[in-house]
Amino acid sequence: FGTHRADVANVIPPQRAGAIAAAAGVADRSGWCPIDPVTLESRLRPGIHVIGDAAIAGAMPKSAFAANAQAKACAAAVAALLRDAVPAEPRLINTCYSLI
């Protein structure tokens, strides 16, 4: 990165899924977790579902609103899978506002 001088600096490290995702074997080389878009189940470790910032979820941003929508879709998918039913394809949406 070189040498930088600043009176105030906001340093943000490279982002990736949390250490628990790597330890569970659900994160790939990108540092994120590839998922099935219908069930939100890990493509690397079947039986583990990943939501929120850790998930590679298409065009969904890394936001709490997106994670909330993913959580509801994931719960519905898990409930369907437990009944041996085919999960419905979720219609994930996002609303994100920045007041800055």
Placement of each model-derived feature along the sequence:
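Central beta-strand plus flanking loop segment that forms part of the substrate or channel wall
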Residues: 19-21, 94-99
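Active-site lining segments that contact anionic ligands and/or coordinate catalytic metals
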Residues: 45-46, 93-95
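FAD-site-proximal beta/loop scaffold in flavoenzymes
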Residues: 4-69
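A conserved FAD-binding loop/helix module that cradles the flavin
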Residues: 54-92, 98
